[in-house]
Amino acid sequence: MKVLVVGGGGREHALIRKIKESSKVDEIFCTPGNGGISYDAKCFDVSATDIDGVVDLAKKLSVDLVVAKFYRKKFLP
């Protein structure tokens, strides 16, 4: 499974470290990420608030799961 985590803070880093422990996960990507996250996931330079950019990146990478807080604001789990 390919996972994309959206954000660049401590919460996202902690999520990535736990996701990395799963045997079901093959690749982890993060956008925008940060220097610390880059040790655990491949980072891309797309702003977390650029929803169209994040969607395009997710499609380009053929991810199976996107983890992003901003969807909660739109009433999605």
Model-derived regions, located:
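ATP-binding N-terminal substructure of ATP-dependent carboxylate-amine bond-forming enzymes
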Residues: 1-77
